[in-house]
């Protein structure tokens, strides 16, 4: 870490005593735990332009949510930009990802308990009153299609231009928008004491289509009837159809 960045961090969170890379690293940024005289913090850093934009968006979302205390997310402490990299500082939260918790679970009974907790946690988010200032200026799906088109033009998406055209022309019937996470996979929620308790990677939090969250939430166990039933014991609002699941998980998510 260069001296300038270290100095900027210490202005926000106090003198740094220790810094270490986390065992679990995301695909879009480098994540470090920092211990200072004021406590434990998380530093996310990225040098890729697309992911720097996501970090900036996450900083704006966390800042608003820290001010309102409306959703279970890390506390925002600051955003730092350098010429070739961006950094966001937030509270370090105890817990492991649901992906890790499911991997470490001793049997299906424990896994089903975790998955039911995930369903309950997501259900609460989708029942939460919309948070001002982090709602998209246009329809959520219109915005995602537009962003996907930008990524295709820049060669930054796995999805093709043909797929995007299909998604644009064959949209699902609109539903009432709710607060959504926007990337609600098992990688992006934390588990503590056997319960899902916190959202991480908050860049996509806004008003949007709850079926997108639901589809990404079940993507890793969509063909396991017992696990799927456990999820819907907790998530009681709606059950996506096969066509809706394919649209959001097998289609739209290809671009993000």
Kindly give the residue locations of the regions a language model identified.
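Short pocket-lining segment of the protein kinase catalytic domain that shapes the ATP-binding cleft
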Residues: 88-96
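Generic structural signal for small/hydrophobic residues in well-ordered secondary structure
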Residues: 31, 62, 76, 91, ...
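Active-site Asp-x-Gly
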Residues: 52, 178-179, 192-240, 246, ...
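Active-site acidic catalytic loop and adjacent metal/ATP-binding pocket
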Residues: 27-35, 42-43, 166-212
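An alpha-helical support segment within catalytic cores of ATP-dependent transferases
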Residues: 2-11, 104, 109-118, 123-182
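Protein kinase-like catalytic domain
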Residues: 66, 122-130, 222, 235-239
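A conserved alpha-helical element in kinase catalytic cores
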Residues: 42-88, 105-124
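ATP-binding glycine-rich phosphate-binding loop
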Residues: 13-36
């Amino acid at each position: 870490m260069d001296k300038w960045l270290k100095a900027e961090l210490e202005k926000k969170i106090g003198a740094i005593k220790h810094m270490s890379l986390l065992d679990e690293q995301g695909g879009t940024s480098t994540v470090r735990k920092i211990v200072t005289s004021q406590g434990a913090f998380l530093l996310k850093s990225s040098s890729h332009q697309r992911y720097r934009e996501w970090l900036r968006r996450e900083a704006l979302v966390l800042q608003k949510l820290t001010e309102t205390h409306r959703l279970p997310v890390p506390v925002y402490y600051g955003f730092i930009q350098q010429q070739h990299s961006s950094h966001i500082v937030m509270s370090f939260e105890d817990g492991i990802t649901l992906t890790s918790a499911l991997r470490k679970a001793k049997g299906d009974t424990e896994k089903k308990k975790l998955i039911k907790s995930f369903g309950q946690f997501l259900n609460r988010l989708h029942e939460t009153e919309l948070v001002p200032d982090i709602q998209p200026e246009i329809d959520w799906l219109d915005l995602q299609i537009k962003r996907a088109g930008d990524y295709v033009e820049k060669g930054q998406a796995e999805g093709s231009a043909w797929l995007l055209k299909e998604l644009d022309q064959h949209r699902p019937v609109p539903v009432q928008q709710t607060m959504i996470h926007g990337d609600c996979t098992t990688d992006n929620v934390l588990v503590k004491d056997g319960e899902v308790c916190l959202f991480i990677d908050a860049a996509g939090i806004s008003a949007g289509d709850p079926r997108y969250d639901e589809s990404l939430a079940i993507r890793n166990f969509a063909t396991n009837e017992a696990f799927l039933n456990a999820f819907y014991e907790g998530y009681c609002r709606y059950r996506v159809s096969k066509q809706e699941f394919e649209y959001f998980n097998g289609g739209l998510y290809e671009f993000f």
